[in-house]
């Protein structure tokens, strides 16, 4: 199948909300069949998640309160990528800020594109 036949083209775009962390946009798009439709989506700067293994082989987790669900969770260290920041620098910074640990060795494990599911 030719993927080009699936592409939606942006006709217009407007901000709905601009916050400190994320931005909500509403776009009017031209569908492959020629009709138009609205798409609402969230722009996020990206984030890293750190899978830190201690010398004893245990994984490092932290407890975080998440306001949106009013609960404390056990989570892997993570954080958003600042503008112009390399993801590895973000990972180093977040590990140090959130846990007090620094890693002597880093290995990139992969990338997940979460925004495709919004």
Segment roles from a protein language model:
Residues 1-17:
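Extended interaction-bearing regions that mediate binding to partners or small molecules
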Residues 4-5, 18-23, 70:
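A short, polar/charged loop/turn motif at coil->beta-strand junctions and beta-hairpin connectors
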Residues 5, 39-42, 48-93, 97:
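Conserved Nudix-box catalytic region and its N-terminal flanking loop in Nudix hydrolases
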Residues 12-49, 55:
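Acidic, metal-coordinating catalytic segment for phosphate/diphosphate chemistry
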Residues 19, 34, 46, 78-79, ...:
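Glycine-centered flexibility sites
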Residues 23, 45-46, 53, 66, ...:
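Active-site segment of metal-dependent pyrophosphate-handling enzymes
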Residues 24-26, 38, 62, 76, ...:
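Hydrophobic residues on conserved beta-strands that form the core of alpha/beta folds
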């Amino acid at each position: 199948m030719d993927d080009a036949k699936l592409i939606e083209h942006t006709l217009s775009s407007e901000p709905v909300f601009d916050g400190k962390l994320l931005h909500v946009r509403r776009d009017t798009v031209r569908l492959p069949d020629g009709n138009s439709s609205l798409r609402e989506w969230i722009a996020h700067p990206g984030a890293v998640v750190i899978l830190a293994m201690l010398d004893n082989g245990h994984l490092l987790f932290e407890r975080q309160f998440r306001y949106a669900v009013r609960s404390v969770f056990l989570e892997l260290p993570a954080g958003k990528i600042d503008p112009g920041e390399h993801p590895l620098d973000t990972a180093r910074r977040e590990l140090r800020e959130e846990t007090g640990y620094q890693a002597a060795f880093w290995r990139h494990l992969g990338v997940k594109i979460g925004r495709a599911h919004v």
